[in-house]
Amino acid sequence: VLDEDKTLLETSAQELFHPGSAQKLFVAAAAFNTLGPQFVFRTEVLFDGAIESGVIKGDLVIKGSGDPSFRLEDLENLVLQIKKKNVKEILGNLIIECSEFDEIRMGPGWIWDLQRHGGNIPVEAFVLNQGLVDVWIKPSDISMNAPHVEIDPLVPGICVSNKAIMANIDPYEKSLKVRKKQQRGKDVILVEGALSLKSRPLKFSIPVQYPAHFAATEFSLLLKKHGIKHEGKILFDHNSCCKEVLASHQSAPLFDLVKKMLKFDNDMYANCILKKIGRIKFGKPGTWPNGAQVVREFLLDVAAKEVDEAVIVDGSGESCFNKISPETVALWLKNIHKKFVYA
């Protein structure tokens, strides 16, 4: 009982257990303590050279901020801001700068080969739509034929292995399975099972292997859509020298992002926030270890424990390496309830 500081039941209190999604509570509190609830992620488009007669005579750079909430409409808004500056052509390359985070996209202890919806999603500093593509499965007309499979948006490097069939079964029978396997650097989406002839179109959200590549492809397509010519290369750089801001987008305040993270148990939000607090705390690219260090130190400080065997390696709690004792969690909850200004 928190208000009375009373223990009603105790068993295996000092043993280490996997915290699962409870770990997001520690990330949320550490983020508020490190960044503040009004902190925002800021994604910028920069350029070098000069703009002459609507032509950028140099490179165009998107500097990712690690914003987990960045969506396609936000990316299109950046392109519209560029268009309002009367930019009609980019002579240089399109550079995606991901220096905010390190290059280790997958968390320690994750199952790299099997990625479920919303989980084990690779983390990069420039992520669009949480690194997910939509897979639409639509019925065909003839029994035993394969259903139609569509990827939206269609991203290079994704291929479909459609082994499903159409069948005269109940449309509510859940016999269709969609999952992803990595194969020689490609994302292979496996569609198996049976789909009812009477089924409505079904949507599955699947993680991509390289979120920044996915986002860069969409940005290039949006430039073309809005009449901005670009025939250069798409490059990925961790140390761009461009400094002049051409367009920018900022996320909702951290308070709102954390609320969404906790309400919907969002793994991508938790992992991006973990790396971001490592980036801000240590002044260098956010990594799994430095973000986890901030969370663990804050956890033990609030729990008022000098020595603890708690292990924190990611933000989402997905990793099998994460371990914490019920005693530490209870002490942390008690003290956060009493003292923490954001509780």
Regions found by a protein language model. Give the residues of each.
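Surface-exposed aromatic
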Residues: 9, 60, 242-243, 313-317
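Short active-site loop at a secondary-structure junction
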Residues: 10-30
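Short, conserved glycine- and acidic-residue-centered signature motifs
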Residues: 21, 212, 322-325
